Design a protein with these regions (language model features):
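Domain-level signature for proteins that mediate thiol-based redox and metal-cofactor handling
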Residues: 2-99
Length: 99
């Protein structure tokens, strides 16, 4: 692996993050609860991380603004269009995950 500059590393990380968001956007059928069950993070977690990192750098971005970035639209609109009710199985798996 070749050496990268700090700037190149930041650019690569940013591009990777954009690809992750694009991948999640193209796979809206993957529900947040499924992500939480399998990986212990979801789109909302990414939004919280985004807002936190922005605030640590003095950028005034709140949670709702961060969710707009991650979801590519207002969260309420995304939820209405793409979020399905959680099944009993999903809720049970989520409870097991919390323990």
């Amino acid at each position: 692996m070749s050496e990268t500059t700090k700037s190149q590393t930041t650019e690569i990380e940013a591009a990777t993050f954009r690809r992750l968001l694009d991948h999640l956007d193209k796979n809206k059928d993957v529900q947040n609860i499924d992500l939480m069950i399998l990986a212990n993070f979801c789109r909302n977690c990414i939004s919280k991380w985004y807002a936190s990192e922005a605030q640590q750098r003095g950028v005034d971005i709140d949670y709702e603004q961060a969710r707009n970035v991650v979801y590519g639209m207002p969260y309420d609109k995304w939820k209405d269009q793409y979020q399905k009710p959680a099944s009993v199985e999903q809720l049970t798996a989520m409870e097991k995950r919390k323990k």
